[in-house]
């Protein structure tokens, strides 16, 4: 709701050949639909591809970047994801590898030091433009009572598919019209759910934290039904940056003068209020993915993995954790006795 991505996309519209790279299929779809109103645009994600003849702009998820292509203008969105242990390497690859005359990198304030460090490593010049929220964000005084306090324009936030479906089911049994968003929702259904809420055919949306990644939805109030999330390793309290990212979706500029945020208990509301008032901790890590050049080596997998293990990058770089790949490899080897299995074959099996 501060307009940084909006301004970057306005510049992208001027490109003869441009690309938008975002974190979500839904976000790629949103940009594709907006761009398509004005100019030929294609969309590429891991799940679907819409190719328009003579398209000037591609809207894609960040993993789909083809670094062999050249662009006039590129937009890399939500670059604070560069520290993410699972997907961050895709932002590292995009920032270091994209071939564009002009690059707009949209991020939260806490990511500026590591991103500008990467730019400096490339000996490129940069300019920092800061944007501020255009609508006031108000933390409510009283905790939210479910389902009595549900109102039109609410977004109820949980962190698992099961919780999304449970809460949506309860609301529907109360006679409310509900949209849902979660990561594994098929693209066509996900698109339909967003459309229903955007067009106010449903009054409430129940979502995981995917809603925080820049989706431009007519949300009046964010309700944190939970304040803990499982991050792949442990269940932990939400970080200040995560709370602010999600809460920031409330009060869409142009529809509301204010956005509201609340939680389901006095302790939860105090926690959300505290996190919103806490400064984000600066990012200190840049995630490195498994290099494609190693995949092209005509060597046994053991040799290639040993090469990767021996690489010790200097800060702020950190290698992606390939523990799960190694565990899978050991399992395959114990079953198949394929000690000389090539890495490309192994990746195909995976």
What residue spans do the PLM features occupy?
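Conserved interdomain hinge at the start of the Helicase C-terminal
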Residues: 7-12, 86, 90, 97, ...
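Conserved strand-helix element at the start of the C-terminal RecA-like helicase core
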Residues: 16-31, 104-106, 112, 148-174, ...
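Post-DEXD/H (motif II) to motif III coupling segment of the RecA-like Helicase ATP-binding lobe
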Residues: 18, 80-138
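Inter-Walker segment of RecA-like/P-loop motor cores
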Residues: 26-71
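Conserved helicase ATPase core of P-loop NTP-dependent helicases/translocases
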Residues: 33, 42-54, 166, 177-208
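Conserved two-lobed SF2 helicase motor
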Residues: 53-73, 197-216
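Conserved segment of the helicase C-terminal RecA-like domain
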Residues: 101-112, 199-201, 217-280
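Accessory helical-bundle/CTD segments and flexible terminal tails appended to RecA-like ATPase motors
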Residues: 279-350
């Amino acid at each position: 709701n501060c307009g940084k991505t909006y301004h970057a996309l306005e510049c992208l519209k001027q490109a003869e050949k441009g690309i938008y790279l975002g974190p979500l299929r839904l976000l790629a779809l949103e940009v594709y639909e907006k761009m398509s109103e004005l100019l030929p645009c294609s969309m590429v994600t891991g799940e679907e591809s819409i190719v328009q003849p003579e398209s000037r702009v591609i809207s894609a998820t960040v993993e789909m970047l083809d670094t062999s292509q050249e662009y006039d203008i590129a937009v890399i969105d939500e670059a604070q994801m560069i520290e993410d242990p699972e997907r961050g390497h895709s932002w590292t690859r995009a920032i270091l590898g994209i071939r564009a005359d002009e690059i707009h990198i949209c991020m939260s304030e806490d990511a500026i030091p590591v991103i500008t460090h990467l730019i400096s490593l490339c000996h490129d010049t940069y300019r920092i433009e800061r944007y501020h929220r255009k609508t006031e964000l108000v933390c409510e005084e009283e905790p939210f009572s479910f389902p009595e306090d549900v109102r039109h324009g609410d977004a109820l936030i949980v962190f698992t598919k099961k919780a999304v479906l449970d809460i949506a089911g309860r609301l529907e049994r109360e006679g409310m019209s509900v949209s849902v968003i979660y990561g594994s929702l098929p693209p066509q259904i996900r698109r339909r759910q967003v459309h229903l809420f955007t067009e106010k055919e449903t009054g409430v949306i129940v979502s995981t934290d995917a809603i925080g990644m820049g989706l431009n939805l007519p949300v009046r109030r964010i309700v944190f039904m939970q304040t803990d999330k499982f991050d792949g390793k442990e269940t932990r309290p939400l970080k200040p940056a995560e709370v602010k990212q999600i809460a920031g979706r409330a009060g869409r500029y142009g529809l509301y003068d204010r956005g509201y945020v609340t939680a389901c208990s006095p302790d939860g509301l105090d926690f959300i209020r505290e996190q919103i008032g806490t400064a984000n901790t600066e990012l200190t890590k840049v995630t490195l993915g498994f290099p494609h050049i190693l995949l092209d080596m005509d060597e046994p997998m053991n040799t290639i993995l040993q090469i990767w293990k021996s690489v010790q990058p200097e800060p702020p770089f950190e290698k992606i954790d390939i523990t799960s790949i190694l565990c899978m490899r050991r399992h395959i080897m114990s079953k198949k006795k394929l000690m000389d299995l090539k890495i490309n074959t192994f990746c195909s099996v995976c």
